[in-house]
């Protein structure tokens, strides 16, 4: 699905134009109300700076938290406006509401190269309902639309989908374009062999991804808590490990489907067991067919790491979504860290490594390896849905290339 990008618009198209840019500024805040990680704000800078270079009037729209359609003083974008001003080296004017007379007057007062940040769009109930009247009023502030919020592209909300009916052209920003290039590209036209590493605690949250990837991958590597549902489906004893009893048949069906398609479907051969779920639990290594009663698996073992490393050796594209174990506990982070290091080494050898959102991004960042990967996705749910082969409303609403 090829979409028109901001790069197709020159200064002659944008000079003096009011451009509504949907960004993803849903950043973490600390106790003092200060931003603890500004990655998402920085990720939007290429798009914002390009518009400023082309003398546009930049109107930014963003959500923060889940205020449920009401004003929540702790969810205002004040800290974001301040940080963005520092990063851009210029004043960013923030509105008190994203629509209404005050927002309109601040937009009307803009000169070329100015930046206005509209207040949290989710303060208005019409945002998440994709209300046409709200979308129309939001769109009336601008003439051109740019969506650079990949992390919100799986939502059909007023600021991601509704506004496109009232603005033209509607194009993808540079972050959105990069996300689609890597994630969509890896699925539609991968350099093969293509491997997917799927982790996380529950099969249920990754069913769609696994089903979709079995059709596209040469190899699938499964780790994290969900492995125990597969083991139990095979008739193995899993002790106190996490199991989704209602997904046993599905686990068997997924393995069978992979086998029928000739896809290498790899599960760990050994696991690190713990006697309780805590960072200082007693631990021991065990083969998967000898898991002790009363113990639970919290990481993959060293033999499994080697098995997975060998399987990945010849791959040209690797997508990773979900950790191998409870990496938040140092004792059970080895499997996840080993995979992160392996992918960093593969990247250096020319393999395209894509970290597909969520906890695996946190794991790679914690290991200090983020810069060594080909692409780190900024979208959690959006990445997952794209990997599932779903159409993202915020993307399909943009102009075709």
Swiss-Prot record:
Q: PROSITE patterns from the xrefs?
A: PGLYCERATE_KINASE
Functional pathway:
Carbohydrate degradation; glycolysis; pyruvate from D-glyceraldehyde 3-phosphate: step 2/5
- InterPro entries documented for this protein: Phosphoglycerate_kinase (IPR001576), Phosphoglycerate_kinase_CS (IPR015911), Phosphoglycerate_kinase_N (IPR015824), Phosphoglycerate_kinase_sf (IPR036043)
Query: Does the record's keyword annotation contain Metal-binding?
Result: no
Record-listed ATP binding positions: 206, 297, 328, 357-360
State the source organism's domain of life. Bacteria
GO BP annotations of the record are: gluconeogenesis; glycolytic process
EC no. given is 2.7.2.3
Enzyme's top EC category: transferase
Cellular component per GO, a single term = cytosol
Q: Which reaction does it catalyse?
A: (2R)-3-phosphoglycerate + ATP = (2R)-3-phospho-glyceroyl phosphate + ADP
Location(s), subcellular: Cytoplasm
Task: Quote the record's binding site residues for substrate.
Answer: 24-26, 40, 63-66, 122, 155
A Gene Ontology molecular-function term? Answer: ADP binding
Q: Which Pfam families match?
A: PGK
Q: Which UniProt keywords apply?
A: ATP-binding, Cytoplasm, Glycolysis, Kinase, Nucleotide-binding, Transferase
CDD domains registered for this protein in UniProt: Phosphoglycerate_kinase
UniProt family annotation: Belongs to the phosphoglycerate kinase family.
Q: Tell me the PANTHER family matching this sequence.
A: PHOSPHOGLYCERATE KINASE (PTHR11406), PHOSPHOGLYCERATE KINASE 1, CHLOROPLASTIC-RELATED (PTHR11406:SF23)
Q: How does it assemble?
A: Monomer.
Query: What protein does this entry describe?
Result: Phosphoglycerate kinase
Which species is listed as the source? Prochlorococcus marinus (strain NATL2A)
Gene symbol here is: pgk
């Amino acid at each position: 699905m090829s979409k028109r990008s901001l790069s197709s618009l020159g200064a002659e198209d944008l000079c003096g134009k009011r451009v509504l840019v949907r960004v993803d500024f849903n950043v973490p805040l600390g106790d003092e109300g200060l931003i603890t990680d500004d990655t998402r704000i920085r990720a939007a800078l290429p798009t914002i700076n390009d518009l400023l270079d082309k003398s546009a009037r930049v109107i930014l729209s963003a959500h923060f938290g889940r205020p449920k359609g009401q004003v929540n003083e702790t969810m205002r974008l004040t800290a974001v406006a301040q940080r963005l001003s520092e990063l851009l080296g210029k004043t960013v004017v923030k509105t008190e509401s994203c629509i209404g007379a005050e927002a309109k007057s601040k937009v009307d007062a803009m000169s070329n190269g100015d930046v206005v940040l509209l207040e949290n769009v989710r303060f208005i109930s019409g945002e998440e309902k994709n209300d046409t009247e709200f979308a129309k009023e939001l769109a009336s502030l601008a003439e051109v639309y740019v969506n650079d919020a990949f992390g919100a592209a799986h939502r059909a909300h007023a600021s991601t989908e509704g506004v496109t009916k009232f603005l033209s052209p509607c194009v993808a920003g540079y972050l959105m374009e990069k996300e689609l290039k890597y994630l969509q590209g890896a699925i539609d036209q991968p350099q093969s062999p293509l491997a997917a590493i799927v982790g996380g605690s529950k099969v249920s949250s990754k069913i769609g991804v696994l089903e979709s990837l079995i059709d596209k991958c040469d190899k699938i590597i499964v780790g994290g808590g969900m492995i125990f549902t597969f083991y139990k489906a095979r008739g193995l004893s899993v002790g106190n490990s996490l199991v989704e009893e209602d997904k046993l048949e599905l686990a068997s069906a997924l393995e069978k489907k992979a086998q029928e398609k000739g896809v290498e479907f790899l599960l760990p051969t050994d696991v690190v067991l713990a006697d309780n779920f805590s960072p200082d639990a007693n631990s021991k290594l065990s083969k998967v067919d000898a898991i002790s009663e009363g113990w639970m698996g919290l990481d993959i073992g060293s033999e499994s790491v080697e098995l997975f490393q060998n399987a990945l050796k010849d791959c040209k594209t690797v997508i990773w979504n979900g950790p191998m174990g409870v990496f938040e506990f140092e004792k059970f982070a080895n499997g996840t860290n080993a995979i992160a290091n392996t992918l960093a080494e593969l990247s250096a050898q020319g393999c395209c490594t894509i970290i597909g959102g969520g906890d695996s991004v946190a794991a790679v960042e914690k290991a200090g390896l983020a810069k060594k990967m080909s692409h780190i996705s900024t979208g959690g749910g959006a990445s997952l849905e794209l990997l599932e082969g779903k159409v993202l409303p915020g993307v399909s609403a943009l102009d075709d290339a």
